[in-house]
Amino acid sequence: MTPTSSPTPSTKRQLTVPTVADLAAEGKAPEILFWVGCAGAFDDRYKRVTRAFARILEHVGTNYAVLGLEESCTGDPAKRAGNEFLFQMQAMQNITTMNGYGIKKIVTACPHCFNTIKNEYPALGGDYEVIHHSTYLQQLINEGKVAVQGGESYKGRRITFHDSCYLGRANNIYEAPRDVLAALDADLVEMKRSKANGLCCGAGGAQMWKEPEPGKKDINIERTEEALATLSGQAAALDNLRGVETERTAPSQHSLQGSIIAVSCPFCMTMMSDGVKNKEQESAVQVFDLAELIASAEGINA
């Protein structure tokens, strides 16, 4: 398995994703709108997450649809960069489209889209129930609709979870992704800077779209070093990181081979993957989204 590949898939089969327009033409409406997001639609790496989550929705029989070409950027990057006018233009376009279809419930795999639609669209007339896919996956597992068995086994593999800023600090969602990972029966290890004290991947606040300011180290490299040190149990490596207090006695060391950095955000996926490449650990450590891991463990082809 290469680090840029998806987890081991089952037999490949065709995936047909319905659009809201197609259902509307038949006089039907989806129970849930799957908001794909820009990264989920255009970024080659995160398209795999989109497929994995769509496979899961199909697998459990969720009545869902996507907007397809009618979906536009939520306006999050524009707003974070200070262009409120552009944000409101993009937001109103989406709100008009969704209200026209009578959309009530939305699920998305992007914390940036989640935060914007949930917390900022209501002021512009867009009131919806918005769920991040980590919470939805948690619900499916708790309800027994996803058994997390029949596919790839993660038992004993070391996994550390990187908290997304917009999922965690902005919306206080910390346990859902961890509950999802716990279902894999893997060896979950927490980074010192986690949950409310987690370190940003470096891409939020529209930083994804600009060159970094001069400094000693890029944030994603710092965060990746912490993840790798946590996975390998190297206290000495943690000593070199800012804001990380290490234990007095070094924990037992582990091989990085087969270890996983789990994420729940397309920005974090890009930044952590680049960090792993920078540290030349691509052959040992992989970066996966929660949906990819669950689809793989369930034996669903993504």
Where is each model-derived feature located?
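Short, flexible loop segments at boundaries between secondary-structure elements
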Residues: 124-153, 193-196, 277-302
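A short, acidic, amphipathic alpha-helical segment used as a generic capping/interface helix at domain edges
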Residues: 214-259
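A polyampholytic, Gly/Pro-enriched intrinsically disordered region
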Residues: 85-90, 146-163, 208-219
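Active-site glycine- and acidic-residue-rich loops that bind
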Residues: 42-48, 140, 165-183
